[in-house]
């Protein structure tokens, strides 16, 4: 028993129990096209750690044992893993709903030009992070021109049906800088 388990038992008088697994979140690596100051995994373009296909096969084995579970792919920029598309297709073949957490600007990187079409054709759900709704704040946190590229990507995703069709949800995650929310 680890220290966390001991502390939980001291407070609750029993261990933690879980209900059925509904979502499996999988981090495909720390490679990212951005260098965000607020990144909790410290992903950057300089990082080289990525999930291998061998490890992805273990993920597929786990996912197969959990039919109906949503698989949430994250990173870094998960799209930059060279096995990203093969994993998405394998998960869909198993009948899983696939959700990808994207920074939007990755679609402008070399080799990523058709990624939005790839995702839309497969009905992959998207969760897009945008640290603010103001261009200055986004560019300060993520780099010059990131806000404009993000908006361009959102328009492209909308043109493919994302955020417009029930089968192609596009959720935006707002990341405030600090312990506060924007004014109402």
Model-derived features: positions:
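Hydrophobic, aromatic-enriched interface-forming segments
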Residues: 167-184
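Short acidic, gly/pro-rich beta-turn/loop elements at beta-sheet edges
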Residues: 36, 110, 138, 180-182
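Amphipathic, soluble alpha/beta structural segments
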Residues: 10, 147, 155-156, 178-181
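Conserved alpha-helical substructure of the radical SAM core
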Residues: 1-75, 79-96
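Alpha-helix termini
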Residues: 158-165
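Core AdoMet radical
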Residues: 23, 43-51, 66-81, 92-111, ...
């Amino acid at each position: 028993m680890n220290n966390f388990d001991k502390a939980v038992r001291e407070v609750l008088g029993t261990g933690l129990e879980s209900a059925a697994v509904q979502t499996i979140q999988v981090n495909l690596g720390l490679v990212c096209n951005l260098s965000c100051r607020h990144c909790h995994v410290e992903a950057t373009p300089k990082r080289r750690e990525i999930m291998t296909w061998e490890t992805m096969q273990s993920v597929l084995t786990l996912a197969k044992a959990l039919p109906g579970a949503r698989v949430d792919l994250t990173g870094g920029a998960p799209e930059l893993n060279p096995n990203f598309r093969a994993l998405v297709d394998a998960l869909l073949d198993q009948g899983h709903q696939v959700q990808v957490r994207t920074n939007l600007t990755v679609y402008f990187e070399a080799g990523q030009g058709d990624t939005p079409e790839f995702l839309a054709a497969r009905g992959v759900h998207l969760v897009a992070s945008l640290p603010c709704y103001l261009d200055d704040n986004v560019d300060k946190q993520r780099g010059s021109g990131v806000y404009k590229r993000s908006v361009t990507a959102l328009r492209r995703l909308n043109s493919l049906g994302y955020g417009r069709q029930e089968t192609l949800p596009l959720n935006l995650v707002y990341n405030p800088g600090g312990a506060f929310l924007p004014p109402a």
